[in-house]
């Protein structure tokens, strides 16, 4: 591909969604930025159903050309976002190392240079706290383009180079895949052995600090910990957090991305209220669980943790780094039972729960499909989840939307309240294949291909138009293309 990778800002505002599959108009197609310099075919003006079920997916010259150009673009994006040992999600908007971003980015880096992929994970785990927690952001270098930075998070007795909360623990999943697919087996085995004790300590921290009552499912105490920051799943629980008299602040994200695509002020006020309260407690794990006014059972965190425990168990055997696997097996056994309490029979979907009320949180989100990725659903429940997913896909042009498109809080362009995220599509696709729903997995994969082809490499995508939105030249989207969508 000639010239630099282009990441032009989106220019279309999506409105509410109808209940029938929409048609992508020719006018919309013409103004969508095609970052990969591939002409949008005439079929882009046809119905989403026609595109979705194209029989020649992954066949023929168009896909071959698209693949070559996409791979080159994605390699350039990861190279440009490389800060020397760690990768930022996107320039300006996210200038630091994010936890689950880096773990997922390592999968893409492994398709380019294995040693660099291991360095990404090693750099992330080097920020681990003494208690085992791995923070959700590591502040390697100063930056004026992001708020809240280290000056807000720092406390007298805790590190000032990171945040005081965590994120979904993807790292063990990545370590296993890198080891399994390694060409340099000696390097991979050495790095897996080096990282295993840190991974085990992190998982132990989750159960000690976030499940002290031994339920089998861990708590999340801040929306930022979920990775799905402004998901409508948190609306009810977050609304009960009283807004404290917090210092005045200026959001930096709105200087990079349209406010219509970002969390709103009332949410940010509560995010910061929680932050300042946690800092006042010096991030003491013994106090946070009991004193936080926001405590939920997040499906994304728990599903990823369960899958990561499976992979940690595999790593224990593959590396010989752990002689007693009973602790890990205990975690998975308790979780297998506990996940049943999160299944909503009427909705045909798993739901998050408010731990302070014991009630389901009302919004249906894409996290409800992740128990397939974790492998915790029975055959009957998996069938119900697959049917629900099929209905969601029928309701939009491109899946998987991050919120049920029929829900009143669905917003097609606002961050985790509607847009499609390729990392979720990858996890759900893996889960569908795990349960034998290969055709549905291909449907998700085809939608993902169309999004990248017509929308570019963005943070997320509008499920109605396919427009790329949020941050441009986005690292984990590029990584998903390299490690999944266009992987040989």
UniProtKB/Swiss-Prot annotation:
The keyword Hydrolase applies. Its EC number is 3.2.1.170. One of its GO terms (biological process) is protein N-linked glycosylation. It is an enzyme of class 3 (hydrolase). GO terms for molecular function: Glc3Man9GlcNAc2 oligosaccharide glucosidase activity; mannosylglycerate hydrolase activity. Pfam families: MGH1-like_GH. Keywords: Glycosidase, Hydrolase. The keyword Repeat does not apply. GO terms for cellular component: endoplasmic reticulum membrane. Substrate binds at residues 94, 98-101, 146, 167, 227, 262, 415-416. It comes from the Eukaryota. It catalyses: (2R)-2-O-(alpha-D-mannosyl)-glycerate + H2O = D-mannose + (R)-glycerate; (2R)-2-O-(alpha-D-glucopyranosyl)-glycerate + H2O = (R)-glycerate + D-glucose. The active site is at residues 229, 459. Catalyzes the hydrolysis of alpha-D-mannosyl-glycerate (MG) to D-glycerate and D-mannose. Can also hydrolyze alpha-D-glucopyranosyl-glycerate (GG)with lower efficiency. Belongs to the glycosyl hydrolase 63 family. PANTHER family: MANNOSYL-OLIGOSACCHARIDE GLUCOSIDASE. This is Mannosylglycerate hydrolase MGH2.
